[in-house]
Amino acid sequence: DAQAVALGRALRDRRGDAQINRAIREGRPLPKAKVDWMVERYTARYVKYRAEVIGRTEALRAVHQGTEEMYAQAIESGEIRAEQIERKWVTRLDGRERRTHKFLSGQKRGWGEPFATENGTIRYPGDPQAPATEVIQCRCALATRIKLR
């Protein structure tokens, strides 16, 4: 129903909830100015939320791309060999993780070996070549170990 839809939006400004409930209870529409105010508040919160999502996603991508580049340069310079690198997928298991990333948690791969999900392959959290469904708002990490022997 209309009430559930209006009050079910997480980004709404809750200061308008009482007026929505009253208007529904009394069977009358909200004044246009109030609707405009609610839409403005929702839009502002949505824009802020999207900026945060994009910022977190891109920051994660930059961190992991930089780390991958660091290891690539170390291999290229001969400081380490590719077969010495072991990467383990670490998922924050707090109930908000993707099902596909929960499955990846703890899996190990060597250098250059991608992880596989039902949506495709992913080299690391935030991988720009992976499907968006696997990277947007990802909070995973890679634990990389260099085997000395």
Regions found by a protein language model. Name each.
Residues 36-149:
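Activation/maturation switch segments at domain boundaries
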